[in-house]
UniProtKB/Swiss-Prot annotation:
Cited function: Component of the acetyl coenzyme A carboxylase (ACC) complex. Biotin carboxylase (BC) catalyzes the carboxylation of biotin on its carrier protein (BCCP) and then the CO(2) group is transferred by the transcarboxylase to acetyl-CoA to form malonyl-CoA.
Cofactor: Zn(2+)
Pfam families: Carboxyl_trans (PF01039), Zn_ribbon_ACC (PF17848)
Native source organism of the sequence: Listeria innocua serovar 6a (strain ATCC BAA-680 / CLIP 11262)
Localisation per UniProt entry: Cytoplasm
Protein name in the entry: Acetyl-coenzyme A carboxylase carboxyl transferase subunit beta
Family membership: Belongs to the AccD/PCCB family.
Residues binding Zn(2+), per UniProt: C34, C37, C53, C56
Gene from which the chain derives: accD
Length: 294
């Protein structure tokens, strides 16, 4: 009996009764976490705010189709050259497999969408790059679609507005990719010589050969807040010049501060800004005139 005082008491066993109020898993896509401020918000609320964080103003990346839908007048967009696709000109191994995966992921045939549209009744030719497709790298088809878009704007006396987002030249197409820098820049110059209006809007990220060519050749050069814009990477530049670069180097705000941009515009204000500029430069029949150049 005395020994019972020092024996280890037996653990009681309890039955586990499942609760009807057990927390259910949140379906994927219902909530979105901001990579900048780490706040979590309803995806639908974020979409209503044009994918701009309600807390910190971070601009989430968006696809070409979504951007066109939020900018142009409903039903006004008519796509150009939708069937142009890459044909692997250099026979790069596994290149076409990657292209097919990006087609399925993005729903696009290439990394850029071009077409006719109107913004508040103002006609334009619009081009939007989509980073979901090969990081919107510029290959032969991207360069060709930009060229054709500019030529269409020239032929129809419309402004050309392009949204850039790119990792640079497409390495799988080698020299054919690099020549698109000169090809697109020359097209912009010809259009400018004919009195055409070009507006570029640089979004995150605009780098490499795209930033070094047509992206900065607009009559108006704008950017979204926080966009990374530059040619070479930060570490490469620091190792080359042997200097520590500013914290905000290669951001839209840094470029604006140093006179390389005309303005840094929130996505929430962009449509009104573009509409205002187009009204200044374009005469519409509704306004009692004809398009410039006619």
């Amino acid at each position: 009996m005395l020994g019972d005082l020092f024996t280890k008491p037996k653990k009681r066993k309890y039955a586990t009764i499942p609760s009807d109020g057990t927390k259910a898993d949140v379906p994927e896509g219902i909530m979105t976490k901001c990579p900048e401020c780490k706040k979590i918000m309803y995806t639908k609320e974020l979409q209503k705010n044009l994918m701009v964080c309600n807390y910190c103003g971070f601009h989430h990346p968006i696809g070409a189709t979504a951007r066109i839908d939020m900018l142009v007048d409903e039903g006004s967009f008519e796509e150009l050259d939708a069937n142009l696709t890459t044909a692997n000109p250099l026979g790069f191994e596994n290149y076409m497999d990657r292209i097919e995966k990006d087609k399925q992921k993005s729903g696009l045939n290439e990394a850029i969408v071009t077409g006719h549209a109107t913004i508040d009744g103002n006609p334009l030719v619009i081009a939007v790059m989509d980073s979901r497709f090969r990081m919107a790298s510029m290959g032969s088809v991207v360069g060709e679609k930009i060229l054709r878009g500019v030529e269409e704007a020239d032929k129809t006396n419309k402004p050309f507005v392009i949204f850039t987002a790119s990792g640079g030249a497409r390495m799988q197409e080698g020299m054919l990719s690099l020549m698109q820098m000169a090809k697109t820049s020359a097209a912009f110059k010809r259009f400018s010589n004919h009195g055409g209006l070009v507006i570029t809007v640089m979004t995150h990220p605009t780098t490499g050969g795209v930033s070094a060519s047509f992206a900065s050749l607009g009559d108006y050069n704008f950017a979204e807040p926080g966009a990374l814009i530059g040619f070479a990477g930060r570490r490469v530049i620091e190792q080359t010049v042997r200097e520590e670069l500013p914290e905000d180097f290669q951001t839209a705000e840094f470029l604006l501060k140093h006179g390389q941009l005309d303005d840094c515009i929130s996505r929430l204000d962009l449509k009104n800004k573009l509409s205002f500029i187009l009204k200044i430069h374009v005469k519409t029949p509704e306004a009692g005139g004809e398009s410039d150049g006619e």
